[in-house]
Design a protein with these regions (language model features):
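An anion-binding catalytic pocket shared by soluble metabolic enzymes
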Residues: 22-112
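Generic N-terminal amphipathic, Lys/Arg-enriched alpha-helix
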Residues: 2-16
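Polar low-complexity intrinsically disordered regions
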Residues: 1-2, 47
Length: 113
């Protein structure tokens, strides 16, 4: 399978809106790494996904910020369950902080700590 086909197959499993948020969030992770604002694997950025399901994207546990891609981000629900398929897990501490904010602040599209 060519790289182009691999990218296309990854992309097709997400809606246009989710894919754009994934791209933007992965870029935010890379930018934070570029400026040295990350703390190894202990800093997190999450982005709320549109829709009634209350899902958000967060970084995979153990992955450095400069390694994160749109397709490696993990979609989770408010119970910490991974939504869809993922080869990765999430950091429980990061999930706890971000889910608490996303649960009560529906106007917050992104959380960084």
């Amino acid at each position: 399978m060519s790289v182009t086909n691999l990218k296309e197959s990854s992309r097709k499993q997400y809606s246009e809106a989710e894919w754009q948020i994934r791209i933007d969030l992965a870029a935010a992770y890379r930018l934070v790494a570029l400026y040295g604002w990350d703390d190894l694997i202990f800093t997190h950025i999450s982005a709320r996904l549109p829709g009634p399901d209350n899902h958000f994207l967060i970084n995979p546990y153990g992955m450095m910020f400069d390694e994160i891609t749109a397709s490696s981000l993990v979609k989770v629900d408010m119970n910490g369950e991974i939504v869809g398929e993922s080869d990765y897990k999430v950091n429980p501490a990061g999930f706890t902080i971000h889910s608490a904010v996303h649960e009560v602040r529906h106007d917050s599209a992104c959380v960084i700590h």
